[in-house]
Design a protein with these regions (language model features):
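Extended, charge-biased low-complexity segments
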Residues: 1-142, 206-213
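Acidic, proline/glycine-rich low-complexity IDRs
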Residues: 129-213
Length: 213
């Protein structure tokens, strides 16, 4: 099973069409294949433990389960992820399953308006010996079209968190151990090739015709 991360939808006006469009946009169109290009698990239950061994969610969804996270705050999501991590550490000594608790996405009301999504990563103190992970998450907003690549680069440690942010402006003086909001610093255009963008847009357009996106 491939490694994946959770998606929480807290937006109050996110219907199944928007969620399908979002999940298709954050698919790995550049390098993925049918069984590997979806890397995110949609979480709708607030009462059940976060499913660390759940398969990734594969759009299009035909129906949306009752979403208990609707209207929740980002702080509630962070608290749930931290609590799940503590449960796993206590039971096994380390987190089990492919689902990555150190990275997750949150689709909130602003995400519906401007087609961004909140990308969160567990805070880390690089100066501590050994490394420590403060109970908080660094976060920034990234466009839907950049979310997969940003997530992937962080997941495989190809790019550090601070490298993605704008140190010359609002983030000056911040540290990755802080667990605070950062300013997205990737000012390049979407990196998905034109060929694969056409494939993606064609799938979304087809689903629009079917009333599913």
């Amino acid at each position: 099973m491939s490694r994946c991360s959770f998606v929480f939808v807290t937006a109050k006006n996110a219907d199944i069409k928007l969620i399908n469009r979002f999940l298709l946009t954050i698919r790995d169109w550049e390098y993925g294949e049918d069984d590997t290009w979806d890397c995110f698990t949609l979480v709708t239950s607030k009462t059940e433990p976060l499913p660390l061994d759940a398969e990734s969610t594969k759009p299009p969804l035909q129906e949306l389960p009752p979403n208990e996270w609707e209207g929740s705050s980002l702080e509630e999501v962070e608290a749930a992820v931290l609590a799940r991590g503590k449960e796993e550490d206590s039971a096994y000594g380390k987190q089990q399953g492919p689902n990555n608790l150190s990275l997750f996405l949150v689709l909130d009301d602003k995400s519906v308006e401007d087609r961004t999504v909140i990308l969160c990563q567990r805070a880390i103190d690089w100066d501590a010996e050994p490394l420590t992970y403060p109970e908080g998450f660094n976060k920034f907003r990234t466009p839907w079209t950049s979310a997969y690549l940003d997530w992937c680069n962080l997941d495989i440690s190809n790019i550090g968190w601070s490298e993605m942010c704008d140190w010359e402006d609002a983030d000056e003086g911040k540290n990755e151990r802080d667990g605070v909001w950062w300013t997205y610093g990737n000012h390049v255009e979407e990196l998905t090739s034109e060929e694969n963008r056409k494939k993606r847009d064609a799938v979304i357009k087809e689903l629009e015709g079917l009333g599913q996106a």
